[in-house]
Amino acid sequence: MPKQIHEIKDFLLTARRKDARSVKIKRSKDIVKFKVRCSRYLYTLCVFDQEKADKLKQSLPPGLSVQDL
C-alpha cells in the first residue's frame, strides 16, 4: 500500500526507521520522487526543487540502499 508524505522532516524520520529497507529516486523534468520501502507501506515524497532533492539525497541514512531510476 502506498502513502504520501508531504514534509521532508517526516520523510527523513521514516527513512531512519528500523524497518526501512531501500530508497528509490525517480526523476522527471520538474519533479523528483523519493520512495522509501518499509515493511508495511511504500512512502513517497514529491520534491519540486532540484537543489532540495540533492540535499535530501545526501542526508539519507548511510545504511540504506539508494537506487536512482
Curated annotation (Swiss-Prot):
This is Large ribosomal subunit protein eL38z/eL38y. It comes from Arabidopsis thaliana. GO terms for molecular function: structural constituent of ribosome. It comes from the Eukaryota. GO terms for cellular component: cytosol; cytosolic large ribosomal subunit; cytosolic ribosome. It holds the Pfam family Ribosomal_L38e. Belongs to the eukaryotic ribosomal protein eL38 family. Keywords: Ribonucleoprotein, Ribosomal protein. One of its GO terms (biological process) is translation. Gene3D superfamilies: 3.30.720.90.
